[in-house]
């Protein structure tokens, strides 16, 4: 009985790990499409960006966000009228 429970737990962990890897592969392929070389913003985290084609996730310094137009990390504009990623998120939350 104990072996069966251990087997089921191990099976569940392996299935979860594989599903998570499949999700990440799909997510990364959308951010860094085949043949694209350069930097691309993380769609879920203003502080992060990806180096394509290697799909390496990088982070800006604290208080900075990645700006796709200049492909650099810039200071965060906390003003809701700003054009940065964080300002857009604040505007979306306030609407």
Swiss-Prot record:
| Gene Ontology MF: a single term | chitin binding
Q: What SUPFAM superfamilies does the record point to?
A: Invertebrate chitin-binding proteins (SSF57625)
Q: Which domain of life is it from?
A: Viruses
* InterPro entries in UniProt: Chitin-bd_dom, Chitin-bd_dom_sf
Cite a GO CC annotation: extracellular region
Question: Can you say what this protein is called?
Answer: Uncharacterized 11.0 kDa protein
């Amino acid at each position: 009985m104990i072996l069966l429970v251990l087997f089921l737990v191990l099976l569940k962990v392996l299935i979860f790990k594989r599903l998570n890897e499949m999700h990440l592969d799909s997510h990364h392929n959308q951010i860094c499409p085949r043949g694209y070389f350069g930097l691309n913003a993380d769609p879920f985290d203003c502080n992060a960006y990806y180096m394509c084609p290697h799909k390496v996730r990088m982070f800006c310094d604290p208080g900075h966000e990645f700006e796709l137009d200049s492909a650099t990390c810039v200071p965060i504009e906390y003003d809701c009228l700003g054009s940065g990623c964080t300002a857009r998120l604040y505007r979306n939350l306030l609407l």
